[in-house]
Design a protein with these regions (language model features):
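Generic detector of short alpha-helix boundary/capping microenvironments
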Residues: 7-9, 345
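Bacterial Sec-dependent N-terminal signal peptides
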Residues: 2-5, 12-48
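Charged, amphipathic alpha-helical scaffolding segments
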Residues: 421-422, 431
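Enrichment for repetitive, rod-forming helical segments
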Residues: 9-11, 235
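Beta-rich carbohydrate-recognition and catalytic domains
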Residues: 27, 46-344, 349-412, 426, ...
Length: 579
């Protein structure tokens, strides 16, 4: 079955392309991109190798990207087509297999439970304490990634952070600048003195920057382009992506491939499952000309080449992607139908076998109300999951990282996600984020940390059974991530549902306890090597526990062959979990 969403523009629809007002250090009114007086450039033809079948067996529709309507779909969120038209056989050769949706499940009597990271008790882990981190002259200050990036660099064996600073005397038109910090543990950070601007940790200035994406491209073969920056700069009505590259993340070179018109708070991410880059572009959509408010939404563009793609990126309704989901949480106080809730931003990254999406969901109020009432706008960070890098599933509408209602707390408002997250630190995932608080009428923006169990987004929980759909694999060693109070047993079935000899429930050695990488073995002594390439099903029998993930590894030590997101200590420098 082929799913297409036809794009249409109703005559009554009037749509605007606007910015995010006072989120950046420069503040000001909502900027508007004026209509262009020159014809749009011809869209590049999508190469045939960018569409087709993904490694996991998902077949992409012939119309790709899927066309969606900025009018009829504006408040419908998304519903992935591949959850209703699953492959007959799912290839699980890449990465740990997470139970964040029903893609892998044929039937179960277990219940899905969502889990949330805990804030580090010593937050914030990075605060504005330098003159060049001050914003203007009124006492506000900014030292946090505005997407930007926090990564672990396995080559240099250190945590690295690129963040936006207020700019101080180095600011251009009251815009932000880019600074660099580093750490040995991801918690305690230093701001080194660098040579770009003597005596400071500034690595990029001179443009009126807003959001920025810094990506350590661990699969890049050209060392001079291993670090990539997609910076939104130019100011109100002039925002463009500026694409820069670097060999070390300190000295940056402009590739002179600016994008077309976009808006602030636009970002970029890499989808390695299809080897494409995605431009996630903010677009405020005015659905009805009589409505004074706009709906915060996103536009989508992809290209296999970051430079060419950057030149062609343009925020326009023909690229409409999604707006808010119909069941988004609303502001507990300001709920006066002013356009909220809306999707403020989306950052995404490959983790194991899926794409993780971090949605900054705006719940209000508008900037003028924030100024009048001396409050901070309420953005909270939600999570979504994708298996194609375009379609997002969001079953859980609770915040992954929530604001604090205590006005004195560092995260009292306007939480924003950070590129690179999560980082894998042992059996934990590190999520970095920016948060804001008020000192009088001045916003203080700093960086925080939240920590989650590895693979810990969702578990199949309770007492019961779970049978997977038909799968194929290339490994031979079976592993699970589980917290088991009772016991867990695993059974291997053939394509017809019959137990494979030597892999029965009775022959499975009992798995107990809490382990993020527990090996499953059978008393028969058999490994799964004899079943490579064959279609099988897996049946789990769980008593009082939580099953987070499973995978079949070619290694007895359990490397999953999946993507390691922002990386971590003792992981492969190519960004893939392998020896």
């Amino acid at each position: 079955m082929r799913h297409k969403f036809l794009y249409s523009i109703a005559i009554v629809a009037a749509c605007s392309l606007t910015g995010c007002g006072s989120d950046s250090p420069s503040g000001g009114e909502e900027p508007v991109v004026p209509p262009t007086t020159t014809p749009d450039p011809e869209e590049p033809t999508t190469p045939d190798d960018l569409v087709g079948t993904i490694y996991n067996g998902i077949k992409l529709p012939a119309q790709w990207p899927i066309l969606r309507s900025a009018t009829s779909d504006i408040r419908k969120g998304m519903s992935p087509f591949y959850l209703t038209t699953r492959p007959t056989t799912v290839n699980i050769a890449v990465g740990r297999q997470l139970f964040v949706d029903n893609f892998l499940i044929e039937n179960t009597t277990l219940s899905r439970k969502f889990h949330y990271p805990e804030y580090y008790s010593g937050n914030p882990i990075l605060s504005p304490d330098k003159d060049w981190e001050k914003t203007g002259t009124k006492g506000a200050a900014f030292a946090a990634p505005f997407s930007d990036g926090v990564w672990y660099d396995e080559q240099d064996q250190k945590f690295k952070m690129w963040y936006m600073a207020g700019g101080g005397s180095y600011s251009t038109n009251s815009g932000g600048i880019t600074c660099y910090a580093e750490s040995t543990d991801g918690i305690s950070w230093t701001k080194p003195s660098l040579s770009i601007v003597s005596g400071t940790n500034i690595v990029d200035k001179g443009l009126q920057r807003d959001a920025s994406t810094v990506w350590i491209d661990k699969q890049e073969t050209n060392a001079s382009k291993r670090y990539k920056m997609f910076q939104v700069a130019g100011g109100a009505g002039k925002w463009k992506y500026i694409y820069k590259t670097s060999a070390n993340g300190i000295q940056w070179r402009d590739n002179n491939t600016p994008s077309q018109a976009v808006t602030d708070r636009s970002t970029v991410y890499k989808n390695p499952f299809r080897d494409v880059w995605t431009w996630s572009m903010r677009h405020n959509v005015r659905v009805n000309s009589s409505d004074p408010y706009t709906v915060r939404a996103r536009d989508y563009y992809e290209n296999s080449d970051p430079a060419t793609g950057n030149q062609n990126a343009k925020a326009e309704l023909s690229k409409f992607w999604f707006g808010p989901w119909p069941n988004e949480q609303k502001h507990p106080t300001y709920n006066n139908n002013d356009g909220a809730p809306g999707i403020y931003n989306l950052d995404a990254i490959a983790y194991e076998s899926i794409m993780l999406g971090f949605f900054s969901v705006w719940q209000g109020p508008e900037n003028d109300v924030c100024s009048k009432d001396n409050v901070i706008k309420r953005n909270q960070i939600m999570v979504g999951y994708s298996r194609d890098g375009f379609s997002w599933q969001r079953d859980d509408m609770n915040p992954l990282m929530a604001v604090s209602d205590n006005r004195a707390d560092w995260n009292n408002g306007n939480l924003q996600s950070v590129v690179g997250a999560p980082l894998i630190v042992g059996d934990k995932l590190y999520f970095y984020l920016s948060g804001r608080r008020l000192e009088g009428t001045n916003e203080i923006t700093s960086t925080g940390l939240a920590i989650l169990r590895r693979d810990g987004f969702a578990s199949m929980s309770g007492t019961g059974e779970l049978t997977t759909v038909g799968i194929r694999f290339t490994g031979e060693n079976f592993f699970v991530n589980a917290k088991v109070n009772g016991e867990l047993r695993v059974e291997i079935l053939d394509a017809n549902g019959n137990v494979v000899s030597g892999f029965s429930k009775a022959e499975c050695k009992v798995v107990k306890g809490d382990n993020c990488k527990a090996k499953v073995e059978w008393t028969s002594g058999k490994t799964l090597s004899s079943l490579k390439g064959q279609k099988i099903k897996v049946k789990f029998y769980l008593t009082d526990g939580d099953l987070y993930a499973f995978w079949i590894s070619p290694e007895s030590t359990g490397e999953s062959q999946g993507y390691t997101a922002g990386g971590g200590p003792n992981l492969n420098k190519l960004g893939i979990d392998k020896k």
